[in-house]
Every structure is written in structure tokens, then in C-alpha cells.
Amino acid sequence: MSDSINTEPSTDTQTNGERTVETTSPSAETTAGESEEQVRDEWRHYEFDGDTKLSVENLDVWYGDDHALKDVSMEIPENSVTALIGPSGCGKSTYLRCLNRMNDRIKAARIDGSVELEGTEIYDPNANLVELRKRIGMVFQSPNPFPKSIRENISYGPRKHGDINKGLLARLFGRDDTEQEGELVERSLKQAALWEEVSDRLDDNALGLSGGQQQRLCIARCLAVDPEVILMDEPASALDPIATSKIEDLVEELSKDYTVVIVTHNMQQAARISDQTAVFLTGGELVEYDDTDKIFENPESQRVEDYITGKFG
Amino acid sequence: MVMQAYIPLGAEPGGIMPAIIGTVWLVVGATLFAVPLGVGAAVFLTEYAEQGRFTALVEIATNALWSTPSIVFGLFGAAFLIPRLGGDESLLAGMLVLGFMLLPLVLITSRESIKAVPDEYRDASAALGVTQWETIKSVVLPAAMPGVITGVILGVGRIAGETAPLILVLGSTLNATAAVDVIGGFRFVSGPPFIANDALLTASASLPTQVWAVIAAGVSGSPQMGWATAFILLMVVLTFYAVGITARTYFRRKLNYE
């Protein structure tokens, strides 16, 4: 798919997250994000029980001359929540967007490496992007429902994939799926914990919902195409605390049936909802990847400890 | 090309209805020609084409065409279209010439409104595994529709009152008493394109040319008729505006929750 849309590379391309601390204290070297610390492979190696859903090997991404992601390898277990944390500009969103090939839409981006979904290479030249994105859904940072009714937002994906037929032609041929559509809309909205709030106004425009409701609608829209993996790019960063906690509950609920990969700026959020956490630090480097408890209680890397205790970033 | 003497001197105009029908058909035909072409070109230029020298060149050419004097479009019609459309001035030639005049504005405004559709919609749709063309059809174009219609309204306002090119390509039937029967003129034929319409290839009256002929060129004896025709022309244009604004309101309502 060759997109001509000139999407600006995400803010992650700008390395603005690092703050070199100008101080005379002897610990200045270690409190800054850029210490001389060498990343060890065993920090990034995470042993887990259960099946691997996504397997990433030696992934590099360049935006023009900017090396946004450096040699990242990690395996993501099935039916769990994997949090990606790190300061802005560390490449975590870039990494997330590689998992469903959304970076293909950025012209300047060059991607090298391998991403396998259940053993199938997604960067295969013959890979079917439509199938891939049906299996790996995505929820964006700011809620982006279509300017259509709530019902149309949910059924948009299945209709475009031909799973639901509606309209004049379908009616003429007696293959109108209005009933199935109704069931799908109800099921998806219930999964996204939005049904109670909108069941009486499904034909209203989705832009009339609050930000938190819009974001849950986007999650429902993503669930309607029945994905296996859900990628979330800071889904709660534009929302108030109550809406955020609803999204967090939802993520935990979803992890029973789906593999969730979530990028977040909020470390408490990562600690609350995720099973394992990957820490990216400045320069597009994966520094540590382990059980969330291990990362937050006893990280191997000094820089990761500094980051999660708030010394920089 | 057979240039007819424009007005048979001394003849009385055959009423105003043929002119009203002529103008309505001209505008409808021009819109049917220019809108699909203009919107299609805008989609290609904004969504598919590499942004570069080619698109810049098209943009300059479009702007230049939009400010080209209408008589030049008329001459293009007389010299290029008419010989290819049976050799006589005709309603179809008039429609095409007005369509070519409408095309640049439709293209410019469609491009602007397609560019204004937020990329978030395109991202959201792509992330659902929907192809680019389906996204354009179901998300981008509906969101751009009000802007496209605004362009068509502006353009129709210009072409409905256009006189100079019509003098050259529409032909003179000031004294016609019957309006062109476009709908009744369709008939099936045995060879491709299997459909023909003789009414489109006949000359027709139109409101602006009739105003010009009666008031400025001094054809016929009653100037009142010219003023009345001018008034009717205004009404017809306002009716087109009303249709356009209603359509735009409908599409805006669909997009907004207010």
C-alpha cells in the first residue's frame, strides 16, 4: 500500500525527552538519561510461560537519517497486557506502530527486521495488510471516531470487510444483515463497557459523545472486527481520571481474550494494569523487559531505576 | 462549422419557457460533467499522486483556467467541440463548455476540503484493515462533501449567467416556441453507445443569451420582455442556490452532532 499522505513522523522522532542534568554533584552521570551504562542482553530477555503471540527480532526504524528504534528484539506473550514505557522520543510509539505496519504510512520511515505474528512474518512482501490489520487492531492516543453515527462507527470495519451486508442492494437480494449488525453493535459496545450509556442513542453522531466515551467507542470499533491483538497508543492520555480508570478496567478485562500492547507515559498506569513491562530509553533503545513487578521493584538497569523513580524523563 | 446569423431580425421571441428549460439543462449538464471529473481529479491529486512538480503544475493550470475569460472557453467550444459534435451549435456543446468552466473551481474547492479532512480518520480506517479506496469512499469524501458542494454552488452561480460562450456554441432559437425535450429525446440505438439523444444536439434558447439579445442587441420590439427575462434568470439562479444550500445543510447535519 503506497500512501501519499504526508503524515508527520510522530513526536517520537524528536529526541526531546532526554534532559542532560547540568549539575556538579558526583552522581550527575547516573541521574541523567545518558549514562555510559551498557545495556545487557539478559536485561531484555524475558522468560514467560504460555505462548508467544508476537515475536520481534532485530527491529530497526529510521525516519530519514534519524535512527528512531535500535535493534529491538522482544517476545510478547498471548492474552496478557504488555506495557511499553519510556520518556518521550524513546521510540515506544514507533515500535507499537511497527506491529501492525502503520509506519508503512509514513513515507520517510524505513523499517528493517522481523515481526512475526504466531510465526508468520508480517513484513513479508506478500503479506496481506487487510488481513494483518484485521488481526491486529489499534486504538490511538486521541479518540478518533468517524463523523458517523455510533452504530455506523461500530459496523464500519465488518461492513468494509464484507462480513455484514446492508443497504439497497443487499435488501434487493434478500441478504440484509440488519439483525446481525444489531447483535454485533451490542456485543462490541458491551465488551467496551459503553452499551449502558449509549444503547438508547445508537443513531446519534459519535462526535456528540464525551472524550472518554469516544475512546471506548474506538475500542468497540476495534473489537468489532474481532482482532487477536490490540495495540493501544497512550489511549488514556487525553482523558480525565475517571475516564482513564474506566479504560484501565477495560484493558484488564480485555486481556482475558486478547493480547494487549499498551504504550503509556503514566508509570502508575503501567504498574496497575500490565503483566510485563518493556522500558525504552532515549535513542530508541529497549533497555529492560521483564515482569511488571520486577521492573518496578527491582530493575537491573540503573537508568531504568532512575527513570521509574522519576529522576529523569 | 456553420455559423448561423444569430437572430432572425424582426422575429418575436417565442416566449420565455424555452429559455428557462435551456438554462436548467445547461446547468444540470455542466454539473454532471464537471463534478465527477473535478472531484475525481481532486481525489487523485491529494490522496494518490506524489506531491511534487506535477501536482504544482496542475494547481497553477487550474488557477489559470479559473481566471480565463469566458469568451475563450466559448471559442474553444466553437473551434474544438462543435466540429466533433455534429458540426452545429448545440445544447450539448453548451453544457460541455460550461462544464469546462465549472471544472477548475470544483477541483480547487474539492482539493481544499479533502486536504482539510483530518488524517486521524484515515489512520483509524487503515488500522481497521480498510483499503485506501474504501476509506476515501466512505470516510474522506463524505467528510469533504459540504466543501465540495460549496464549490459547486459558487461555480453554478458563475456559469448560470454566462452569456459570451453561449453566443458562440448554443445556437440561436430566440423565436422557438417549444423547449428542448431532453428527457424525451433519449432513444436506444443498435450500435455503441446504444443510446442517443437528438435533443442534446439541437440548438437551444437560454436565459442569459435571451436577455442579451432582447436588451442589448435590440432584437424584438418589447424591452419589458428583456427585463422580465433578467428577473427570471435571477430567480433560476437563486433556486439553484437553494438546492445547493439544502444539500450542504443535509451533509453538514450528518457530520455534526448539533
Curated annotation (Swiss-Prot), chain A:
**GO MF terms held by the record:** ATP binding; ATP hydrolysis activity; ATPase-coupled phosphate ion transmembrane transporter activity
Record EC number: 7.3.2.1
* Domain of life of the source: Archaea
Keywords attached to this Swiss-Prot or TrEMBL record, sorted alphabetically, are: ATP-binding, Cell membrane, Membrane, Nucleotide-binding, Phosphate transport, Translocase, Transport
Location in or out of the cell: Cell membrane
- Outline the segment boundaries, as ranges, of region: Disordered: 1-40
Domain ABC transporter, by residue range, is: 54-308
The UniProt annotation places ATP binding at 86-93
InterPro entries in UniProt: AAA+_ATPase (IPR003593), ABC_transporter-like_ATP-bd (IPR003439), ABC_transporter-like_CS (IPR017871), P-loop_NTPase (IPR027417), PstB-like (IPR005670)
Report whether Cell membrane shows up as a keyword of the record. yes
Q: Which GO terms describe its cellular component?
A: plasma membrane
Catalytic activities: phosphate(out) + ATP + H2O = ADP + 2 phosphate(in) + H(+)
User: What is annotated about its quaternary structure and interactions?
Assistant: The complex is composed of two ATP-binding proteins (PstB), two transmembrane proteins (PstC and PstA) and a solute-binding protein (PstS).
UniProt family annotation: Belongs to the ABC transporter superfamily. Phosphate importer (TC 3.A.1.7) family.
Task: Tell me the protein's name.
Answer: Phosphate import ATP-binding protein PstB 2
Q: Provide the species name.
A: Haloarcula marismortui (strain ATCC 43049 / DSM 3752 / JCM 8966 / VKM B-1809)
Gene that encodes the chain: pstB2
